[in-house]
Amino acid sequence: MSSWLPQNVQKRLLIYLLQQISIFSQIDTTNLDVSLGCRSQFAFHDVELNVDHMRVPHITVESGHISELELGLVVSGGLDITGDGLCFVVRPELSEVAGSHDLAQSLARSIMDLTNSMMQPLPEVLEGDEVLANSCSEAGDAQQPASSSALDKMRNKVLERALSNLTVRIINVRIQVLFPGQQSITVLVGSVELSTVDKTRRVDLQDICISHSELVPSPEQPDEFMSTSASNSIYMSAIDSLPFGSRSKMEENARNVRALLQMDKLHVTFQGISSVEDISIRDLMLHMGRVDVFLDAIIAVDIGVFEVLVQFVAEFQQDTEVSETSNTLQNYKRFRQEQNLEEDLQITGFTIEELRITLSQSVKVSVIDIQLRNRYIENSTVTVGRVTICDYDLDLLHIDAGSKPCLELTVDSRKLQRIISVDGDIHMDISSTFVSSLIPLIFRLQELGRGLHFVGTNNCKMSQEFKTQVETKTIILSLPVGDDTLQMIIQPISYELSLHTVFTDFISISKVQSSETRDIAIIREIKIGYQTANFQVKSYNLKLSETLLTSKLRGSVSSVELYCSDSDIKWLFDGLSPYQDMITPYMHSKPEVRKPIMNKSVRILSASSVIHRQNVFSDMVLLIERITCSLSADSISSFGNVKTELNSSLLSLNTDNSIIFHSSCVKGSTVFSDVKYCLFEPIKTKDVTKPALFVQRFENGKLKVNVQNTCIYYHAKWLDILDESKGTKSTPQQESAVPVPLQQRIEVKFHDCALSMHPYRLKSALLICVNRCILDISVPPANFKCIIRSPTFMLADDCSNMKTSITESWESLVRYYSKAGFAVIGKSGLLSCTIKQSGGQICLDIDVDRIDLSICADSFQCLIQTLIDIKPPVSFPDEKKYRTEPCSIPVFENVDDEFFVPKGTSNLPALNDMHIVDDFINNSNNSFSEVQVIEETEEGSPLKLEDNGLLFDEGHFNKEDIPVATDSKFFPFGPVAIVLHLFVRKASIKLHDGYDWVYTRRSISKVVDDLEDEVHKQDQPGRVETSLFDSIYLYATPDSNIKKAVSSNIQSEDIIAENYSSKMKLRPSKHHKILIELTNMKLTFSGYSYDEPTEDIADWSTDLLNSIDVEVKTFEIVDNVATSTWNKFLTELKEAHGGSPSMLALSISLVRPIDFLYATELIISAQVSPLRLHVDQDTLDFLIRFSEFKDARFDLIDDYPDIVYIQRFEVNSIDVKLDYKPKKVDYVGLKSGHTSELMNFFTLDGAKMTLKRVVLYGVDGLGELHNCLSSIWTPDITRSQLSGVLKGVTPLKSIITLGSGVKALVTVPLKEYRQDQRLTRSLQKGARDFLKTTSGELIRLGVRMASGTQAILENTEEFFGGQGARARCMSARLPEDELSPVPSACDEFDLFRSSIPRKQSPIVPIPSEEDDIEPLKAISLYADQPQNAQKGVKEAYGSLGKNLTIAYGAVRRAQRDARHSISAQDAATAFARATPIAFIRPMIGATEAVSKTLQGISNQMDRDQLVHMRDKYKQSSHYQRKRER
């Protein structure tokens, strides 16, 4: 109970309060009630306050109003102040400069005025009018302090007595705070009571409510709005639940009223304000009841309100800062600790019974029993009894703390340590309602965070003395996803505030299905730290150049382990899609790009240079040592788990809203059918300087990926999973309309990567090395665009023999894989690929600039078989392809056997001559014993009279009025599923001699060694024969050099030099032998959709499965065999060109005759332009040997072998003009009956023939197709086109041509005379034709005779030791990779020591790669022909001079050798060698001069002949350079 207050002091206190009523302006006496006596009382009604005398720091009081105010003296000696309806309208006053201690000075001044007023003498008569009249003057005098300090103790005692007996109670308090933008916050307090009990000040507040509203200007007083009447223009929807207050008449001026906070009671007790010297507040105790915070309404407040509040708080904190005094020094603190002296605390206790935070209408957070106990010597603690989150009546949060507080904060002042601990495991069940409530809060807070600048927070300094640590127990989060639950378990978290570091051992993410829990992801050793100073980390950009990441937030993770299946991924996507739909509406608003500082380039000084690196600012950098992912396919269990590993990864969240991720090493593997397969792996494992994987996501959603130094694998066996998935495919369900997502673009770049493709059954591998590739993907719809620059193709025959690790340094991928065992087979130019998806159709366009292939016989077979086996084989048993058992048809099921039998008639006896029918059937079945292949010509085959007398028209069914199944349009087909367009501008295929594979070379060497051993072991000399790879035939005799024969056979050499090395030349030849060139090749593949019905529901229709159309504009085969002087093996016949757009057109269709049977058939149609062939026998033998090579390792054996059945084959008539040069005759084959060897006896020049149009039906396989065509075309040529062939035989060609000229001399005049009856003109025309034909042929005959004479002379000279034909090629060097060279050196022939001449060797064998000397090439005498007679004479003069120079040089060398000779025999030998050259060389020059002159004359007469000669004969290099000039 408070002490008694003397009456004089009581009156003085009342006088002071009345003096302070001076803030009332123009008080109306009608509203003033005064009661004097033993209990003096003053009552005021509806008084407007004069706000000019109110001074509150950083606050401007706009208006004030109080409805009722009573001041009275209590009989017990106290003073009561009672008020009702107190309203204030205030506005925050923000200024850059404010007083530092305004609040403290105002409080001290008020205490001093109160004390002085009570110490002054009272007037004798206390009348109300006098008090009011003198209030102002007395108040001014009271402000002067007493001059003497002797009364300080009395003054303090009087003040204490006065305050202890002062009671203030005000109800219905309303404070309205105005903000810019017509925003306001209103604070309502039901009652406020101030009292003192036992020297303890008590403040009780009841029914507190804080709300926000928007103000609407009054139409009557728009200019005076927000003035003194603004306090009555507030409408509060929450006041209906409050027991006080009435609504204002102008409540309609407020709109969008939201309650922000409600509190039922607030009880405050404190010590202090007892004297002038003691105005501090000590031992402050706060006790709150139930507090409701409406967070959803708070974040909906306009951002301008938050900006003002933040700045106001910042300035208020600056004003209340007190400079350090002695009691804050460390020495003073240590003294108080040693003396056990307790320091006065401002807040000693804080209690909240229940704190309820409303996130939405259904989700509420409840915090119960919050207590603060603050002691100086002992540890200060803050405890939280219980925390719950409720979704309606469902508890989402549970902390297993038992009876203990779930949350505790301990402050140890001695150790300067703060510990925040959670005393139980946290279980959080996240519901969809909770997520839908939390998402708008998060995005709104992010928006507020971006909009607020937090003015003044930079000046707030956090104490660094205390070490704050946060410790939690296990945190378990559960999120319902579909029918199951996604659970996250976070191990105890440790947070160091001083170090700004958060650490936890690991986080596990699991899938809870019924009672089963399975881990999906585990993250280990997570550490996240914030640094006050920026740190830098090395990173990379899109060009894989080094950059620097600058950030303050850094995290590290030891490992990330992912374990999931395809069903888990689908479950996550389907289950999380509702949550994504919740986030999507908030993602439409484009966030503001934060650019606190622009990216800069940083110069890094080194010892000898300056390195410029780009500097990128990041919000957070996360370093991950190791990422492992194990992905399994539940629907395809046989594929196994796909394990992926990424090492040394970095994840950066940049300030420009982009994301960067890169990893230095990427590996992937799987176990398929108990065999481990590699998916992708790094190529270079040592000295890796750039990341293997780089991913960057930009703000607009575009994703860019860079892959480097990685080999990607493809195994054909993986496609078996498609068959497995077909069996498990569920029935398609009708899907509801789904909104089309935004288009996503992904750009992938590959640098120094490789694609390794492995076939299904073979051990070979096809490798594509890519230096640079750009892949652009956009979805949806799925569109792909790929550009590859200069890919290189490599091939390996057996991957088990590859070198797995190469320690040597390598310059490029090609060199690396070459060392590993791969062979380079070709390269390509620019390759572009486009894939578009439209509806159910996929369109693939491939454009290739150039393809160059260089391949040998063994690698060619390996390549073809690998391409065939690059997909799983498809084969079916005969039961699925054909109807092996005829189905029984009950023909007589509904036939009445007695229908034609008369009633009463007995059954006739069975006839005994029914064998007549059997004889008829037996005699007639021979007519159908065999089905023959039908052949047709353009005019139709002549009708043939068969033995039975019937006349058959074989072309009846191929007439124009009957549709023929020549294209896919004849058959019904379904919609197109896939379309492939391939366009190759130029393709070159170079066929090399020799062998690429070590296995092939070792096999040949082993067989040769075995042959030599077998020959030496024979008792009687004999011949041993064997064959290899179906193309190499070997035999050995005791006197033969088997290795020399093998090299001759493999390298296409007829004669081997005597000094030939004993080592066989089995490696690929340095220069190609055959060059196949194709230009403007177009390929179109169309795959159609088809059904696979059963026999019961089948309609027995024919299905078109796919079709292929190939067009080639030009197709040429260039002859580069060393022993051949011809240039083009095959080219287009130019004089017969009919204007066809393509030289070759091929159409292939794959059909299924019966829809429910799996048997397929081919329909082939070919169109070929007229051909010009220059066939050299050596070249032909090389092509045959090349194409017949067969290695058993590459045989493809199907489970159910099948032969390609050709339903229909059609080829047009082909005009062929053939030149053939035989080299040798196989007499053994001729004796065996091979009549084709007779062609090797004749040389053909311009033999004309026509391969007539053929249509074949029912051909079993390509081999049978070749036999059928041969059996049709060969008899036709020998029967009806023998004259055209004989005209091309060289000895007969001139005679036939001259004979045709003589014939024209007679037939032409007769024909012309019959037409115009003019004898003279007819004779002139006949003579002109005769001269043109005979003169041209005589000139060509002269050329052949001169060239033949020159060849004889050159051979004779070479026989006597001269250069022979090599003299013409002395200056002709082979360009790189063009024509095969011949050596320039020859063996020396000793005229006196040997009488046996060496074998004629005009063409010296081609060396392999081991040879260092570049040989010369063989040039025909008909090559390098002059264009006209003038150039012919000029070249004749040059040829004659060159040969005379050679003869003169031989004589000069003989004279020099004779002078330096020791004996006469040596001198004679020198002259003997030079004599044949000296005599023969001038004759060779003369014959060559005649030949060149006649060639010039002939070419001038026939210009087209020169073009034909250039196509036929190889040109020398100097002649080609001359033409270019």
From Swiss-Prot:
UniProt key word Protein transport: yes
Gene Ontology biological-process annotations: autophagosome assembly; autophagy of mitochondrion; glycophagy; lipid transport; pexophagy; piecemeal microautophagy of the nucleus; protein transport; reticulophagy
Cystine pairs: none
Xref: PANTHER family: AUTOPHAGY-RELATED 2, ISOFORM A
Entry membrane topology: Peripheral membrane protein
Name of the protein described by the UniProt record: Autophagy-related protein 2
Stated role: Lipid transfer protein required for autophagosome completion and peroxisome degradation. Tethers the edge of the isolation membrane (IM) to the endoplasmic reticulum (ER) and mediates direct lipid transfer from ER to IM for IM expansion. ATG2 binds to the ER exit site (ERES), which is the membrane source for autophagosome formation, using basic residues in its N-terminal region (NR) and to the expanding edge of the IM through its C-terminal region. The latter binding is assisted by an ATG18-PtdIns3P interaction.
Keyword Chloroplast (UniProt): no
Protein species of origin: Eremothecium gossypii (strain ATCC 10895 / CBS 109.51 / FGSC 9923 / NRRL Y-1056) (Yeast)
Subcellular location: Preautophagosomal structure membrane; Endoplasmic reticulum membrane
GO cellular component, one term: phagophore assembly site
One function term, GO molecular function aspect: phosphatidylinositol-3-phosphate binding
Gene that this sequence comes from: ATG2
Origin: domain of life: Eukaryota
